[in-house]
Structure formats: structure tokens, C-alpha cells
Amino acid sequence: MQMQVLTAASSLPRATLLRPAAAEPWRQSFLQLQARPIQRPGIMLHCKAQLQGQETRERRQLDDDEHARPPQGGDDDVAASTSELPYMIESIKSKLRAARNSLGETTVSAYDTAWIALVNRLDGGGERSPQFPEAIDWIARNQLPDGSWGDAGMFIVQDRLINTLGCVVALATWGVHEEQRARGLAYIQDNLWRLGEDDEEWMMVGFEITFPVLLEKAKNLGLDINYDDPALQDIYAKRQLKLAKIPREALHARPTTLLHSLEGMENLDWERLLQFKCPAGSLHSSPAASAYALSETGDKELLEYLETAINNFDGGAPCTYPVDNFDRLWSVDRLRRLGISRYFTSEIEEYLEYAYRHLSPDGMSYGGLCPVKDIDDTAMAFRLLRLHGYNVSSSVFNHFEKDGEYFCFAGQSSQSLTAMYNSYRASQIVFPGDDDGLEQLRAYCRAFLEERRATGNLRDKWVIANGLPSEVEYALDFPWKASLPRVETRVYLEQYGASEDAWIGKGLYRMTLVNNDLYLEAAKADFTNFQRLSRLEWLSLKRWYIRNNLQAHGVTEQSVLRAYFLAAANIFEPNRAAERLGWARTAILAEAIASHLRQYSANGAADGMTERLISGLASHDWDWRESNDSAARSLLYALDELIDLHAFGNASDSLREAWKQWLMSWTNESQGSTGGDTALLLVRTIEICSGRHGSAEQSLKNSEDYARLEQIASSMCSKLATKILAQNGGSMDNVEGIDQEVDVEMKELIQRVYGSSSNDVSSVTRQTFLDVVKSFCYVAHCSPETIDGHISKVLFEDVN
């Protein structure tokens, strides 16, 4: 019969398994999760990766793994892009290196440039002329065809009007470029009414404060604008309301985000405010506010700051500058999530070292050493630095909490979705020594994000990104401990907007080092290469499975595919095929042997069969033909072949010993509850296949650190395997409280992987433990349908 295909979107809630309990649920191993029957017991729903002809499309009667057909769908374009991957990588490297001394790769703000253009010459002796004529020139060169100024790629009426009004006022102030002034004024006249229909979710920062000030300047210049337009009355009212809420003494007492919009305020005590300048000389990294302050004070540091800005941006200035911390952190985050960070290890390390130097005990700002910190940059820095082994304290979040609630900036008027999203991601990288603050932060952020999802309000006030709702849903549906690298990357390839994403400041702006089309193109090419290799490895693995007749031992082709997927979703680099296939083959063969031993367990004879298998494994000259147990003989043959295939020299003995230890965990009493031992077998196999284990084997035997890693991994995976069996109809005994126990142990594992100062165990080996544990977490967390959907998407659905 024709099977229906189920795929699982990341936004789907986790489903409860409802199929009838198996007569012997313990026979269903960690890998042998089947989707629910949809017609009658016995008919299994396989993922479309198996049944939709993908394999046939790839095989083309291949006899050798060295031949492959490129993915279908624009094959020529895909082949061209993958062949150009090395050039794309080098181009990105050059861009990252060129930005190493940058204070932020961002686009110019016409609004801020207009405020700079308004500054009167400081040494003019009373004569009126612009201090920055190059700002006037920039304005003249960058008018859009429709007469406006602003972001050319996206229309938000507040962005277009505030940029256009600022530029028209600047040109009119100096009486230059009359034709362009007229076109800009006409644009304002034709579009002012749109303000009444604008979406307040995407308001420009400080718009209700700064736009009326520009209108007042325009009125004083005699510009023909309907200042009584109904759309403006609401803005005037909001300005008065907001100004009334600003405590004047607090504004002058300490640095706050209000400094960013000083150009919209009057009657300021400049002597007090100038003490809050950033190290670069600005007021809260705002060129517009700094230009206004310069006009009022003539401060030399403000002048130098603005000169630096317009020199770096060809006469213009961004809406925020510097943004060096934000730029570096977000670019690293994007490269990691796109799955291509391994190409830029030295550049990323340099960026993170820079961020570490700028992280203070009370958090981080988006630019330099700006005194006003925010939870968004702090969370991103905390997460990335911890994941790269830096010593950072969770106490940095204490400064953003008040009465059980968290804020991005003190005194904010509304909460930011992305700030809470990034804080939620950061709160999951927990060490045992952390106080309860991270747990409290996680609970608060999750509740906030869940509420926003429930109301369908997944837009942010600081960025316009079509993929953001999907990003948030994925984070809520798949916690970090159950999110596999290739799954996250495959999903993020569809979420990442590249150059289409726009950020919201006083106007729209782009972050070219963060949102870059070349990143996306390179990531797609890299993932396509991964899929090509994966499909070949899958065909080879399936032939191995058939050749060894493992289906006769209860291993389904679906289990084989899932075993390979779990390995490939964690270890995906092309040069790590031996580790990836070693993981997959070991998991498959362990399932086959487990199935064989369970048959003997039913008769109380598992111990005897285990001894025979151990004896046969230990003897290289074992005479297969003398065994009356053909099943045992075929399994030993497959095991011997696996060892010969993946281990050489002394490593062969190490791999045999690993299997011996795993077999010894089987007893009549264990009834197959060997999830922890299977996890250790996988870790040892991966390490042996990589060549790392052999060179360090003796030292690892004496390492307390390594021993503790084994203990934690074994304990966690044993509990998770119990949970998986229960979900598949097994005993519910000892299941209660497993999640909490696993979470406690996960904290220690994370610390030992990312926060250990010991050199006994390499960082790659530590990561192997985490990869294996996360694969167990993933299977315990996901429904079979979700897993099948991920298999299809990661391995078989071409990247568009």
C-alpha cells in the first residue's frame, strides 16, 4: 500500500506516543524507534527518506562509493556553487580579517548624517558655514529615485520620513541643492499621512522624540509641510507623554539609553552630560546626539569622534557607532549556526578574545566600552565565550533583573523579543557552580517567548527578519541539549535572511558582517557537499547491513538509517568519515547483538551466550564453522569485520576490548538496560576511529577527569535509554524525575567539556562525550515522526 509521509516542522509541539505497547518493549532499543501505525499493528510508517526514491536517485546502480550524482534541482547551479566553495571561504576570511580593527561594519544613516551636516563651523568667527561639508555632499549623492532618503531595500514609512526630513532640513539650512530639497519636500508632503497607518511594532528608536524636533526646525525654515496633519497630532502627544516620564535629574545623574536621543531634548545641562561620554568620545555611540552636543558645546572629543566617523564612512555616519562588540559576536553566532565556523577558527578566536576583553562584571554594551550595558550583547557574549572555553561568570545577568523580571536596558518602554531569545539560549549553558540566576532567567525568558508565540506576536522592535518566528519556535521546541548541529544548521539555512534582514535604529540599517549573502551561499554549498557525501555513505552502510544479514537479527533498515543520521548530525565534517561511520556501524551492530542476547535472556541463558561471544571476539583464530549457532557466527564475523575496517594495529586490540566491556555488561538480570554502556562503546569507538584514543590511551586510563566523563555520560544515557523504552511502551518504573536528574548531570558535563582547566583530556574528546549524550537527549526528546522529518530534511532534501 502507498504510505503517507510525515514530516515534522520545528514549530510542532512534541507529540505523545500513543501506539499499543509492545509485548516485549525492552526489545525496542535506543535506535529502534518506529513511528505510529496508521492502519493496523504491524504496518510501520517509514520516513520519506526511505520511500520516496531519494536513494534510487542517488544510486544509479553505483558499484563504488567514489561515484555520485549531484543533488537534483538546479544541478548545474549547485555544482558550480559547491566547486566555488574554497573561493567563497577565502573571500569571507578576507572580510573577517579586514574587519578585525573595525569599529563596526554597518550602513550609513541619512538621519545621523543630516545632524552632522547641521553643525555650524566651530572656528568660523561668527560666519555661518557647515563644519562638515562632506556630510552635505553625502546627502546630495544618496537621494533615492523617489525623492526620499532611507533604506532602499525596505519601505517603512517612519524610516523614509525621518531620514528625508532630516536631509531636507540640512540642505535648507545651508541653502544648497535646491532641486533635491524640492523633491524631498514633495515626498514628505505626499507620504506624511502614512504615519497614521504605521505599524508601531516597528517604530524607529526615539521617533516620537526626534521627529517633532525636526518638524520644528523645518517650520522655522519656512518649509511647506502640513504641521497640523492629523497623523502628526498623535506623535506630538506621545512626545509630551514620554518627556513627562523622563526624570530630568536621572538623565543627568548617570548614563542611560536616553543619551542616545539627546538631539530630541531641550534645556540640558551639558557640563553634567559630557561626563558620560564613551571612551571613543561619543554620547552613547550616537552620531546624531553627539553632533547636537557638539553644536551646543564645541567639545573637542565630540569633534574628533564625528571626524573619525565620517572619514570611515565616506562623508556619512551610521546610526550607532561603534558597534564593534555587536558586530563581532553576531557574526560569530551566524557562522556557527550556518555550520561553517570550522573554516574560520583563527578569525573567530580573535573576535572572541576581543569580546572577552570588553566584557565587564556588569555586562557588555554593543560598542567598545560604552558605559550602558544591555542584556542582549551580554547574553550573546556569555553564550559564545562559554562555548569556547572562556571563564565567564553568570553573575553578569544579575544587573538586568529587578523584582523577578529581566530587562534589556534599564527604563525600557517595551520588551525585546530577540533580547529574551538570546538570553534564553544563553541560560541553557549552565555550570554546577552557577547560582539560581540562570535557572530564573531561563524560566522568565521561556515564559515570555511562549506567551509571544501563543499570541502570534513573534516580531521584534530592533530587527526585521522573516526567519525570526521560526528561530524562536525552534529554540522553544528543541532545547540546546537536544539540538543536533546539522539539524540546527539545516533549519537555520531557511531562517537566515542574509542581506534581506534590516535592523531598527533611528532609521533602518544593515549589518554587513552579520547579514551577508556570501555566508548563506557558502553555507548552502557546504551543506550540499555534506549531503552528497552522506548519501554515498548511507548507500555503503546499507550494503554493509545487507551483506551481513543484520535484518535477520531484528535490525530494520529504518534503524540503520537513524543510526547513521545520529552520527552524521553530530560529526559532519568530511574528514571525519571514519568516526561518523564507526559510530553508525557500532550502533547498528550493538543493536543486532542486543537483539540476539535478548532471545537468550528470555530463557535465562544470556550469561552463557555473552561468554561465548566474548570468547569468540578474543580469539582471532576462532573457527566459525564449529559453532552450532549460525546467528552468533554471523554476528562475530560482522564484528570482526567492523574492527578490521575501523581500527589498525594496537587500536584493533583497543576496539576489541571496548566491545568486550560492552558485552560484559549483559547479564540475565540486565534485560538489555545497557544504554549507558552503549554510550561508552560509541565514545570509545569514535575516539579509536579518529586515532586520538590510541596515542593517549595509557594516560587516559589514569585520568580522573576522563573517568568522570565516562561516569557522567554512562549515567545520563542509562537514564535517557530508560525514558526512551518507557515512551515506547516499556515499564514506567524509575522514570519519574529522570529529566531533572539528567539536567543536573548535564551541568557538570557542560562544565567538563567547556569549562575544564585540565589538559588530561583533549577538547575534541570531551566534545565526543557531549555529542553522544546529546544524541540520546535528542531521541528522548523527539517523537519518531519528528526524527524522521529531520532525517529527510538533513540528508535527503536538497538545499535550495
Curated annotation (Swiss-Prot):
Gene3D superfamilies, sorted: 1.50.10.160, Farnesyl Diphosphate Synthase, Terpene synthase, N-terminal domain
Keyword Isomerase: yes
Single GO BP term: gibberellin biosynthetic process
Binding residue positions for substrate: 242, 461
Domain of life: Eukaryota
Listed SUPFAM superfamilies: Terpenoid cyclases/Protein prenyltransferases, Terpenoid synthases
Required co-factors: Mg(2+)
Induction comment from the UniProt entry of this chain: By UV irradiation.
Pfam family, one: Terpene_synth
Entry keyword set: Isomerase, Magnesium, Metal-binding, Plant defense
GO molecular function terms listed in the Swiss-Prot or TrEMBL record: ent-copalyl diphosphate synthase activity; magnesium ion binding; terpene synthase activity
Family: Belongs to the terpene synthase family.
Record comment regarding domains: The Asp-Xaa-Asp-Asp (DXDD) motif is important for the catalytic activity, presumably through binding to Mg(2+).
Misc remark: 2 different ent-CDP synthases exist in rice, one being involved in gibberellin biosynthesis and the other in phytoalexins biosynthesis. Phytoalexins are diterpenoid secondary metabolites involved in the defense mechanism of the plant and produced in response to attack (by a pathogen, elicitor or UV irradiation).
Function description: Catalyzes the conversion of geranylgeranyl diphosphate to the phytoalexin precursor ent-copalyl diphosphate.
Name this protein carries in UniProt: Ent-copalyl diphosphate synthase 2
Organism name: Oryza sativa subsp. indica
